[in-house]
C-alpha cells in the first residue's frame, strides 16, 4: 500500500513538473502575443524561450558544443523554412532573419533599422560618434575616419610595413622550440598591423599593453552584463578603462605635435591625426573620450576578426593538401615571373592571386567569424507579412545562409573552387555585412591575410598538435586549444 502511494505521488509530481515547466516556458511567448495582439501583422513563428533569459541557454549549448547550426536548424524543423523567426536572446526580444533578400533589406534600410548590439557589446565597444548620430553624420564620420584604409592608393602605403611584420613574425614563430597557440600568435600579428595603420606606431610597449587588455575586453562581448567583481563583464569594463588610459597619452602627444606644426619627414595622416582634426556638422571637434572610443572600437574590430580568419585559412589549407598545393603553386608563379630587381610584393601581384582570394572567401564562408549582424527596428516594419516591432533587435543570421545547401552545394565542404565564375546572389555572402555600414576594413583585412598566406605558403608549414581538437563557436568559431601547433620552416625561397 505504501509503495503504491509513493509511486502515485511520484507520478503526480512528475506530471505537475512537466505541465508546470511547459506553462512557465510559454509565458514569454504569451506575454508578447498579448502585448502585440492589436498590430496589423503577426509576429513570425518561433520560440521566445524562458522568462528573463529567453532562449539564451539553447544558444550557449549549441554554440559551445561545436554544433552552432543546430540553433537555426531546430527553428526550421519546428516552424518551417520561413526565413524569419522570433526569439529572445541577449536580454532582448529579437527577430532572426536568415533568408538572403530579407537580410539585405534589413542591412540596407537605414531609415527603419539602426545598429542594435546587445548591452554588453554596447557598453564595451561604445562609439558614440559612429552610433548615436544621424545617418548624414554617420556617413561623414565614416568617410573621414576610414580614408586611411580605403582605396588602392591608401593600401599601397602599408605594403612594405605589413610585409616586414609578417616576415619577422613567421621567422620568430618557426624558431620557437615549443608549440604555440596559433590564434594568439595571429592576434599579435594582426594587432601590430592595425596599430601601425591606425596609430602610426611600432612601439612594442604600447602594442603589448593594448593587446593584453583587448583579450579581456573581447571575452566580455557576449557575457551577461553584470558589473560586479568576479563576472566576465566587470573584468572587460576594467580592461576598457585601462585601454583608455593607454590610448590617451598617445593622443595627447599627437595633438602637441600638430600644434607645433608639421615635422620634418612627416608623411601620411593616420587615424589619430584625422580624429583630432575632424568636426561634426555644428563645427565642434571630437571630445577626447570620443576619440578614445573610436580608436578602441576600430582597433578591436580591425584585428580580432582578421586574426581568426588567418588562423582558419591556415588550418583549412593544412587540412586539404591538394588545395594547399594549388595555392602554393600560384604564389610561386607570381614570384617567378616578377622582375629580378623587385624584392617585395606589389598590389598588382596581390590582384593576380585569384585562387588565394577564393581560399580567403571560402574561409570567410565556412568559418563564419561573426555568426550574425545586429540591428534594431526604429519603427514597426512588415517583412513578408510578419511584423518586426519597433525597439526589437534584428539578428541577420549570415551563418545560416553561408551553410545553406540551396546557395552553396555541399556547404560543409571547404572548396575554394566553388568560387570559379561564381557570382553570389545578393544577400548570400555577408562576411562583412552590407549597406552603408558595410565593414570599411574589408579590403585591409584581405590584404593582411593575402600577404601572410603568400609568405606562409612559400616557406612554411603547420603541424597541429591536436588536429581533432573540439571546436567551439562561442564567442567566435575556434579550436578549444586555440590551434596549438608548430610553425615549421621548409624553404628559404
Curated annotation (Swiss-Prot):
Free-text tissue specificity from the UniProt record: Expressed in roots and stolons. Not detected in leaves and stems.
Industrial and biotechnological uses noted in the record: Saccharomyces cerevisiae expressing Glycyrrhiza uralensis CYP88D6 and CYP72A154, combined with the expression of Arabidopsis thaliana beta-amyrin synthase (beta-AS) and NADPH-cytochrome P450 reductase 1 (ATR1), accumulates glycyrrhetinic acid (GA) and, to lower levels, beta-amyrin; these GA production was increased in the presence of G.uralensis cytochrome b5 (GuCYB5).
Binding site for heme: 439
Primary location class: membrane
Membrane topology field: Single-pass membrane protein
InterPro entries cross-referenced by the UniProt entry: Cyt_P450, Cyt_P450_CS, Cyt_P450_E_grp-I, Cyt_P450_sf
Positions of transmembrane segments: 7-23
CC annotations in GO: endoplasmic reticulum; membrane
Known catalytic reactions: beta-amyrin + 2 reduced [NADPH--hemoprotein reductase] + 2 O2 = 11-oxo-beta-amyrin + 2 oxidized [NADPH--hemoprotein reductase] + 3 H2O + 2 H(+); beta-amyrin + reduced [NADPH--hemoprotein reductase] + O2 = 11alpha-hydroxy-beta-amyrin + oxidized [NADPH--hemoprotein reductase] + H2O + H(+); 11alpha-hydroxy-beta-amyrin + reduced [NADPH--hemoprotein reductase] + O2 = 11-oxo-beta-amyrin + oxidized [NADPH--hemoprotein reductase] + 2 H2O + H(+)
Cofactor(s) needed for function: heme
Keywords carried by this UniProt record: Heme, Iron, Membrane, Metal-binding, Monooxygenase, Oxidoreductase, Transmembrane, Transmembrane helix
Enzyme class: oxidoreductase
Record-level Gene Ontology MF annotations: beta-amyrin 11-oxidase activity; ent-kaurenoic acid monooxygenase activity; heme binding; iron ion binding
Subcellular location, record wording: Membrane
Superkingdom per UniProt: Eukaryota
Cited PROSITE patterns: CYTOCHROME_P450
GO terms of biological process kind: brassinosteroid biosynthetic process; brassinosteroid homeostasis; sterol metabolic process
Enzyme Commission identifier(s): 1.14.14.152
Note: The CYP88D subfamily seems to be restricted to the Fabaceae.
Recorded family membership: Belongs to the cytochrome P450 family.
Function of the molecule: Involved in the biosynthesis of Glycyrrhetinic acid (GA), a natural product which exhibits anti-inflammatory activity. Catalyzes 2 successive oxidations of beta-amyrin, producing a precursor of the triterpene sweetener glycyrrhizin. Unable to use 11-deoxoglycyrrhetinic acid or ent-kaurenoic acid as substrates.
Protein name stated in the entry: Beta-amyrin 11-oxidase
Species in which this protein is naturally found: Glycyrrhiza uralensis
Gene name tied to this protein: CYP88D6
Amino acid at each position: 500500500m505504501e509503495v503504491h502511494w509513493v509511486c502515485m505521488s511520484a507520478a503526480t509530481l512528475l506530471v505537475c513538473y512537466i505541465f508546470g515547466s511547459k506553462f512557465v516556458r510559454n509565458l514569454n511567448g504569451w506575454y508578447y502575443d498579448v502585448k502585440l495582439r492589436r498590430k496589423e501583422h503577426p509576429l513570425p513563428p518561433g520560440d521566445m524561450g524562458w522568462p528573463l533569459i529567453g532562449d539564451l541557454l539553447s544558444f550557449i549549448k549549441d554554440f559551445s558544443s561545436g554544433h552552432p547550426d543546430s540553433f537555426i536548424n531546430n527553428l526550421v524543423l519546428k516552424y518551417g523554412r520561413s526565413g524569419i523567426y522570433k526569439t529572445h536572446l541577449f536580454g532582448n526580444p529579437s527577430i532572426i532573419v536568415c533568408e538572403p533578400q530579407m537580410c539585405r533589406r534589413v542591412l540596407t534600410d537605414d531609415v527603419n533599422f539602426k545598429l542594435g548590439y546587445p548591452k554588453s557589446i554596447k557598453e564595451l565597444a561604445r562609439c558614440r560618434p559612429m552610433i548615436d548620430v544621424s545617418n548624414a553624420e554617420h556617413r561623414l564620420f565614416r568617410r573621414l575616419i576610414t580614408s586611411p584604409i580605403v582605396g588602392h592608393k591608401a593600401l599601397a602605403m602599408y605594403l612594405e610595413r605589413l610585409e616586414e611584420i609578417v616576415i619577422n613574425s613567421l621567422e620568430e614563430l618557426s624558431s620557437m622550440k615549443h608549440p604555440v597557440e596559433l590564434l594568439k600568435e595571429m592576434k599579435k600579428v594582426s594587432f601590430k598591423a592595425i596599430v601601425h595603420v591606425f596609430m602610426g606606431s611600432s612601439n612594442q610597449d604600447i602594442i603589448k599593453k593594448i593587446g593584453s587588455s583587448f583579450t579581456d575586453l573581447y571575452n566580455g562581448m557576449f557575457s551577461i552584463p553584470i558589473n560586479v567583481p568576479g563576472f566576465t563583464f566587470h573584468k572587460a569594463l576594467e580592461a576598457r578603462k585601462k585601454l583608455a588610459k593607454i590610448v590617451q597619452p598617445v593622443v595627447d602627444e599627437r595633438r602637441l605635435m600638430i600644434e607645433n606644426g608639421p615635422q620634418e619627414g612627416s608623411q601620411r595622416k593616420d587615424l589619430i591625426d584625422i580624429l583630432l582634426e575632424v568636426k561634426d556638422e555644428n563645427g565642434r571637434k571630437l571630445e577626447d573620450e570620443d576619440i578614445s572610443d573610436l580608436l578602441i572600437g576600430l582597433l578591436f574590430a580591425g584585428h580580432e576578426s582578421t586574426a581568426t580568419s588567418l588562423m582558419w585559412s591556415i588550418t583549412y589549407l593544412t587540412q586539404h593538401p591538394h588545395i594547399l598545393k594549388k595555392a602554393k603553386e600560384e604564389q610561386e608563379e607570381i614570384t617567378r615571373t616578377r622582375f629580378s630587381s623587385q624584392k617585395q610584393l606589389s598590389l598588382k601581384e596581390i590582384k593576380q592571386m585569384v585562387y588565394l582570394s577564393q581560399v580567403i572567401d571560402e574561409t570567410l564562408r565556412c568559418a563564419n567569424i561573426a555568426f550574425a549582424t545586429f540591428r534594431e527596428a526604429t519603427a514597426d516594419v512588415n517583412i513578408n507579412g510578419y511584423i518586426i516591432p519597433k525597439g526589437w533587435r534584428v539578428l541577420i543570421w549570415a551563418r545560416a545562409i553561408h551553410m545553406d545547401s540551396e546557395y552553396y552545394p555541399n556547404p560543409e565542404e571547404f572548396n575554394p573552387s566553388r568560387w570559379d565564375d561564381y557570382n553570389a546572389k545578393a544577400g548570400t555572402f555577408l562576411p562583412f555585412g552590407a549597406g552603408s555600414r558595410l565593414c570599411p576594413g574589408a579590403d585591409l583585412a584581405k590584404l593582411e591575410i593575402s600577404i601572410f598566406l603568400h609568405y606562409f605558403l612559400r616557406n612554411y608549414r603547420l603541424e597541429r598538435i591536436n588536429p581533432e581538437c573540439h571546436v567551439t563557436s562561442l564567442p567566435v568559431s575556434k579550436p578549444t586549444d586555440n590551434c596549438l601547433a608548430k610553425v615549421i620552416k621548409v624553404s628559404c625561397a
